[in-house]
Amino acid sequence: MSTFTNPLKSRLKETDPLFGLWLSLGSDAAAEALAHAGYDWLLIDMEHSPNDSGDVTSQLRAIAAAHLPSEPVVRVPSSEAWLVKRVLDAGARTLMFPNIESADEAARAVRLTQYPSAGALDGERGVAGAVRAAGYGMRRDYVQTANAQIATIVQIESARGLQEVEKIAATPGVDCLFVGPADLAASLGHLGDSKHADVQAAMARIVSAADKAGIAAGIFAMDVASAKQHRDAGFRFIALAADVMWMLRATRQALQEVRS
């Protein structure tokens, strides 16, 4: 089988913006269909969506079945070693960790994605050969190549994380800082108001920290206008809302138009 590679990890180092979509429906059919939409990446959400490790595996298969460039990302609900291991064994190559608040937490997230090896003796990932990620044992170089190909994205979504953001960004193995705008706004005392000046200043600080560390900054955008604003502000890894949001917007608009 071909060598295990992660094109998204290398693309995160480039300057061109990468636009993605949140998959919240828990549907492998939706995941496969949306792989045809042309997004750079599709995020399978385990934190706020009804996805367990089996659902994630089904959606990873569905996206792969499209044979198109959309790269799957999986957001795990927490830094639990057993869960991270299952998601990686299922074939995920890029993981997002929520609410990282210190360099130590960021370093732990990275360790969870790494096999113990000469370059990462503190890696915490358990070794299993006959898993989907390794072609069920047919991709024999997987264990040797996986460490260098797994991408780690950490979310900054609290006042505490913001205060440590420069140290988090400088953590070896972190590929991207991703802003959780709703939670960040709430943590800064502005629940429901991510447009507040304090929140905007926090976002600018996160972009600056990422730039200084030579990594990407990402964010969730509610609509096209917001996505363009974030792009112009220096964000390079941008989620253009979620599948369920676009489904409701389009169907409601169509119904309103036909009834008018």
Swiss-Prot record:
It catalyses: D-glyceraldehyde + 3-hydroxypyruvate = 2-dehydro-D-gluconate; D-glyceraldehyde + pyruvate = 2-dehydro-3-deoxy-L-galactonate; 2-dehydro-3-deoxy-D-gluconate = D-glyceraldehyde + pyruvate. It comes from the Bacteria. A divalent metal cation binds at residues 157, 183. GO terms for cellular component: cytoplasm. The keyword Metal-binding applies. One of its GO terms (molecular function) is 2-dehydro-3-deoxy-D-gluconate aldolase activity. Aldolase which can catalyze in vitro the aldolisation reaction between hydroxypyruvate (HPA) or pyruvate (PA) and D-glyceraldehyde (D-GA). The condensation of hydroxypyruvate and D-glyceraldehyde produces 2-dehydro-D-gluconate. The condensation of pyruvate and D-glyceraldehyde produces 2-dehydro-3-deoxy-L-galactonate as the major product and 2-dehydro-3-deoxy-D-gluconate. Also catalyzes the retro-aldol type decarboxylation of oxaloacetate, a general property of known pyruvate aldolases. Belongs to the HpcH/HpaI aldolase family. This is Hydroxypyruvate/pyruvate aldolase Bphyt_0320. It comes from Paraburkholderia phytofirmans (strain DSM 17436 / LMG 22146 / PsJN) (Burkholderia phytofirmans).
